[in-house]
């Protein structure tokens, strides 16, 4: 079974659907993994790391998609790209199915089974595939770091010979995954 990881071409996208450590596990399980050259570059993973993990590297995106039994990517494919997928293939990515009806219809017409990552329920059973919670967790952390860099003061309480600086007060709106991580990060930074 051939699993394909195409490079993301959306401007500003730095994520990759599969990292080299996961490639090792999939290859050990008997899958053949092909990665488009440069797919992991913006996430800090060189092609050589994928090769060391057991993946093949290709520069031919069309052949990669045509031959794949499973396609893993972060962003949705273009409607035009769906015709490159073979009938019976499985496509896994964020799809935005409520707003991308034409794309969902095209995938269905092409006989491609689609898994929309944002529709996977947040349950214990599906936890290993819950990409939204992972992304929200990172977002909560990053937002506090970015907010701290914009403050005209420091977050933790500091006692110096010149006086004491009281800790910053942080107000987080929301208590979902991102909000809870933001609260935890702000507390760890001393707010």
PLM feature spans:
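Residue-level detector of alpha-helix initiation sites
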Residues: 76, 138, 176-177
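Glycine/serine-rich phosphate-binding loop and adjoining beta1-alpha1 elements at the start
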Residues: 2, 8, 79-169
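Short glycine-/small-residue-rich Rossmann-like dinucleotide-binding loops
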Residues: 69, 75-76, 95-96
């Amino acid at each position: 079974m051939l699993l394909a990881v195409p490079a993301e071409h959306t401007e500003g996208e730095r994520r990759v659907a599969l990292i080299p450590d996961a490639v090792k596990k999939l290859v050990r399980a008997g899958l053949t993994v092909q990665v488009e050259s440069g797919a992991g570059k913006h996430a800090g993973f060189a092609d050589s790391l994928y090769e060391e993990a057991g993946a093949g590297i290709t520069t031919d995106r069309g052949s990669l998609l045509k031959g794949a039994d499973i396609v893993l990517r972060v962003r949705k494919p273009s409607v035009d790209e769906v015709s490159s997928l073979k009938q019976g293939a499985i496509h896994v990515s964020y799809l935005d199915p409520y707003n991308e009806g034409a794309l969902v219809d095209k995938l269905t017409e092409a006989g491609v089974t689609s898994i929309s990552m944002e529709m996977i329920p947040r349950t214990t059973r599906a936890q290993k595939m819950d990409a939204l919670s992972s992304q929200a967790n990172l977002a909560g952390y990053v937002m506090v770091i970015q907010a701290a860099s914009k403050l005209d003061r420091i977050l933790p309480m500091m006692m110096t010979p010149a006086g004491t600086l009281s800790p910053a007060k942080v107000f987080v709106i929301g208590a979902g995954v991102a909000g809870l991580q933001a609260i935890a990060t702000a507390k760890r930074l001393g707010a």
